[in-house]
Amino acid sequence: MTMGRDIDDLPKNDANHTALTPLWFLERAALVHPSRISVVHGSQHYTWHQTHQRCRRLASALSNLSIGLGHTVGVLAPNIPALYEAHFGIPMAGAVLNTINIRLSASRIAFLLAHSSAAAVIVDQELFSLLEESLKICSEKSKSFKPPMLVVVGDESCHPNDLRHALAKGVIEYEKFLESGDPEFKWKPPQDEWQSIALGYTSGTTASPKGVVLHHRGAYLMSLSGALNWGMKEGAVYLWTLPMFHCNGWCYPWTLAALCGTNICLRKVTAKAIYEAIAEYKVTHFCAAPVVLNSIVNSSPEEAILPLPHVVHVNTAGSAPPPSVIAAMSELGFRVTHTYGLSETYGPSTVCTWKPEWESLPIEKLAQLSARQGVRYIGLEGLEVMNTKTMQPVPADGATVGEIVMRGNAVMKGYLKNPKANKEAFANGWFHSGDLAVKHPDGYIEIKDRSKDIIISGAENISSVEVENALYSHPAILDASVVARPDEKWGESPCAFVTLKPGVDSSNEQRLVEDIVKFCRSKMPAYSVPKSVVFGPLPKTATGKTQKHLLREKAKEMGPVRKSKL
């Protein structure tokens, strides 16, 4: 009887327990591979020893200004070394990192700065004017607003006038700020792994953005999960096509340190730049939304450097990738892994794990299987597709729709200053994603739609994702998104917004519309066929997600379909 108590009563102490934090990965990388290249950005090349010192300098410089535990530091920058260093240097000072979407409006950034009570902001020189405008809005809205300390990052690839403008305002330059710090700074790991490491914000498409708070433990576990689920090896060469400011780059800044790999920064993402980086740096991995994959597939012969020198692994998420795009990427020599997640789950938290028996399948069937969202990450303890009324799992029949819910270490601490949203998100002991899916007999889940994106036409529920997948397989279509448009007869009907491939003759739009509708009729039930087709570029977020809320507004402004027929 006492044996059990003796076993369980052994206490934690400094020798056998340390709070988990991904910051330790940087320490190890600098120790094991000090001379290996850690970060590349144009002519800038840093080793792991140098990156380690630069991050400690950043932590020291912040600490010298009494910025640390309880403070938030914002970073407004594209994929540059300073943003990578911020993922270590800011939490090394004990502060919380808030990476800010560079494509937001000044008013939206002003909201984030005020809501997060930013003590400091590190800003890229090209974005300084945007930040100035945001700070002006903050000051006008609240007399008690305390402006954050500003640091501007210079970049040789940008026009020098932007940097001169910031320096003329008395803002300190990033490299000089680092010089004020100690390269041997003795940073302190968190006492509690529940301590916050990062703050990110949801897109806020229908209301104010919600502040997603992440902890050190989750960041540590999901960094390693990202490597294990993707089969990444030590020394991986990773191309930053995914914005680091989005969900902390899906935790890959920390992953690359754990693997002692090399980060190739890409300030602007184009198919040509991706191909060139693969050829020059021997890139092994990159992450990208389906829209980026689409640009690779449809790149011109002048842009593409083919055949690829080796297999390049691609992690795609952000929206459901059309099977046709996955198939085309595979034919080019890319190995695509589909993942799924949210800001609230540290980025991807499910993965469509590859199975050996798939090797012999036709590429079209393989693409269909790979387009599913898959199974839970190693770092996620619970994943289900639930009937939200009964909170019971739906049958694994590939047909019954439920909501994706999660629980475990990969789920956020909660929303900052938003108890109502926290209560709703964590109802019944699960995190509710708002995504609707089915579970297949093999246990793999597949998203059918966001709950708000389901189109209800008459008595039929139409998945916008399924209609979009059909549109993507049309030879003239480059990009597509489907939303509900008011319909006098059916309440709602599908409205397709379409971007045509370069070179497609669009002089006769009516003929194109008829061709697309005819094509869709051969692929889906009549009630799912788009009743409206609109041509033009689609509005995108920073990570390539289509901004459906804007398209829904546009469809509503178009007025109801008056002669819709099934």
Predicted features and spans:
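Conserved AMP-binding/adenylation subdomain of ANL enzymes
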Residues: Y220-V237, F245-H285, S295, S299-S300, ...
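AMP-binding/adenylate-forming catalytic core of the ANL superfamily
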Residues: V75, L104, V121-V123, F286, ...
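Gly/Ser/Thr-rich phosphate-binding loop
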Residues: E175-K176, A258, V283-A288, V297-Q368, ...
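Structural core segment of the AMP-binding/adenylate-forming
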Residues: N64-L65, F88, M92-E179, P502-V504
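Conserved structural elements of the adenylate-forming
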Residues: H52-S60, E179-E184, V212-K233, T241-F245, ...
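Conserved AMP-binding/adenylate-forming core of the ANL superfamily
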Residues: H17-T18, L23, S35-F88, S105-A110, ...
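Conserved pre-ATP/AMP-binding loop-to-beta segment of ANL
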Residues: P34-I37, V151-C158, H165-Y201, A207-S208, ...
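Conserved AMP-binding A3 loop
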Residues: T47-H49, I197-L221
